[in-house]
Amino acid sequence: FNRQPSLHRMSMMVHEIRVMPGKTFRFNLADCTPYNADFDGDEMNLHVIQSEEARAEAKILMRVQEHIITPRYGGSVIGGIHDHISGAYLLTHGDRFLPKKLVMEVLGAVGWDGELPESIERDGVTGYLGTDILSLIVPTGFNLDYTSRSGDNVIVKDGKVTGTIDKRGIGAEDGRLL
């Protein structure tokens, strides 16, 4: 995809194709920031790469995954927006308790096959803390300490998250966890 004017290398990036119903081209909402696309009638151009050689080169140099960090200021330009941030906030704010049945359904739906944190029991229901579930996707050995916009001290020690994750944690252009 490309959105003009092409002012920087992130104005044109390679996306993986998945055929879906409908007559419009779609891409993940989190990928809009580098294109400066805001859905007010923005025009995007789709370029189809013709040769195997060109496809290989584009995958190496132009994939979205290669442009998460902006060269302008070294921060993440692609990150959580809207529902991602709200979900992370609701999952980690306070002492969020999730019943084991719900956790199993969600982790099963995404194909999780790793180990689970230690379960706890509240009011006769077995479950997990929201921060423990979020910690499943944070790499072991990752450490971080910052204050969230809501004023909570967020500490990630060896991949274990404590505190409230908000835009400062996973937001585009602001995400400390990214």
Predicted features and spans:
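Long, charge-dense accessory insertions within large macromolecular proteins
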Residues: 1-16
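Feature marking long nucleic-acid-engaging regions of large polymerase/nuclease enzymes
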Residues: 15-178
